[in-house]
Amino acid sequence: IADYIDTLGAATASSYGYTVRGALQTGNLDVRNLTNYGIGNAKPNIVTWVESHDNYTGDDATYSKITNEDIVLGWTVLAAQKTGTPLFFSRPYNASSDLIWGTFNKIGMSGDYLYKNSAITAANRFRNAMAGEEQNIFNPSDSTSVIFIERGKKGLAIVNASIKPYEFNVETNLADGEYKDRVSGNTYTVKDGKISGTIENKSTIILYNDGYLELAPAAIVKVDDSVTGSYNTDSIEVKLHVEN
């Protein structure tokens, strides 16, 4: 892949996606693996993803192995980093491990609305706010199920892939003060260069103040999950759901 980057200027780090998915399935977010992009000494001009359409439907069959919960965790790991340009794959509408193509797999139909999830949008907005900031990625001394991604002295993203909550008390580059989690709304305090608190199992925390923009939640308009998109009569009654 390094040769492609040198020749073309950038490339997709597909094998890194495999690493990310493996970390999610095992609950092991070892920083040594998640900072190894598989590109040798090449510039990190890479496109990263949790999964692609090939992974979803191909031999990897991620539709049956990687849950939406996993995707949220993996996407936060990708989006919070300085390295790479993350690409989000929108699965088919209402897809599941038992229904690979979902219930409304038609041309022109929107895919799954996971990309509007509050944790996903928080990670995306964090990425924009942290543009240009250096990164410091580490695991706490007693767990590789939790990863901390600091961006300069402005922000911190925390991901817990464990099935148990994790209490932390770690040193941080963030200035002393209070920081609001842009996912839950909870407040965390940095004092004397340390931050402490609890991150729930299988969850994320996004902390920053500088650069935060107050935006309305992403609106969702969708048909009821009972509607399949196929019918053999002259008409069909459809129920719509609106969320904001």
PLM features: residue spans?
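Proline-enriched interdomain boundary motifs that mark the N-terminal boundary
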Residues: 215-225
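Aromatic/hydrophobic beta-strand junction motif of beta-rich domains
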Residues: 236-243
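Short, solvent-exposed loop/linker segments at the N-terminal edge
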Residues: 225-234
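Active-site-proximal helices and loops of the catalytic beta/alpha 8
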Residues: 1-213
